[in-house]
Regions:
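Active-site-proximal loop/helix segments of hydrolase catalytic cores
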Residues: 152-155, 163-193
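Binuclear metal-ion centers of metallo-dependent hydrolases, dominated by the metallo-beta-lactamase
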Residues: 133, 177-254
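Binuclear metal-dependent hydrolase catalytic cores
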Residues: 1-170, 236-254
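Catalytic metal-binding/acid-base residues of hydrolase active sites
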Residues: 54, 76, 174, 195, ...
């Protein structure tokens, strides 16, 4: 199983417009964060999680021109608005890209981007969208899904299992439910939203995430969806063993 963090930043990215690096050292390349997205690959099957506004640059950096499916965690702009770039993936595949989203997210996508799913102006649809079930198999990847609180909406929490390796992905969450605990407990790698140190209404702060780590006991925890207050080197020095800041281009192969 190979996992690549395509983007590790929050909705504004780092630096924010105006060259705002906040507390992040501009000389550290791992502080430059595009909007959050993930790529999971196993035995020839590639799954893209979310189509961030930075998707084109993210896939170019990863040297990836084809994905076999897309899963959307939720309908917020920073996780969706690169959807038009799936046209190139459509051309690479030669057929509409299989896409999956929970029912509310799928409805929002169809409303905002009808042309992507129906075609328009003589152009064919580029995505074949299905409702994301609680369990899904894509190639040899077994995927389990739970609904996660994220302010007034929910996001899809994902667990990928293949070849005895388990990967959890929990972005855009505001609380930990029993279903989430069951999904993520003891995973080999847990990639989790950790927006900043100060509390936030719809994302977890660092102290909250570290409490979850103590409870869930993943083998390795990687922080993502971080804002300009979360300097890479500072986090590396501060975090306990087994917990690390993610960055754009972070990879693991197990």
């Amino acid at each position: 199983v190979k996992v690549r963090i395509l983007g590790s930043g929050t909705s504004s990215g780092v630096p924010r417009i105006g060259n705002d690096w906040g507390d992040c050292d501009p000389a550290e390349p791992r502080n430059r964060r595009t909007r959050s997205s993930l790529l999971v690959e196993h035995d020839g099957t590639r799954v893209l999680v979310d189509t961030s506004p930075d998707m084109r640059e993210q896939l170019l950096a990863a040297r990836v021109g084809r994905v076999d499916a897309v899963i959307w965690t939720h309908q917020h702009a920073d996780h969706v608005f690169g959807i038009d770039d799936l046209r190139q993936v459509y051309h690479a595949l030669g057929h509409p890209v299989p896409g999956y989203a929970r029912e509310d997210c799928a409805a929002a996508l169809r409303q905002q981007f009808a042309y992507v799913f129906k075609g328009a102006g003589g152009y064919p649809p580029t995505v074949a969208l299905s409702v994301l079930p609680d369990r899904l198999a894509l190639g040899e990847l077994a995927i389990r899904v739970v609904d996660q609180p994220h302010g007034s909406i929910t996001s899809a929490g994902l667990r990928f299992d293949a070849a005895g390796v388990s990967i959890g992905y929990a972005t855009d969450i505001s609380a930990m439910t029993d279903a989430m605990r069951d999904l993520y407990r003891g995973v080999d790698v847990w990639i989790v939203d950790a927006l900043r140190r100060r509390p936030h209404a719809t994302h977890p702060d660092l102290a909250t995430v570290l409490g979850w780590v103590d409870d869930l006991r993943p083998t390795r925890t990687v922080l993502v969806h971080m804002d300009q207050s979360m300097d890479y080197a500072g986090l590396r020095a501060e975090l306990p063993d087994g917990v690390e800041p993610g960055y754009d281009g972070w990879e693991i192969a197990r």
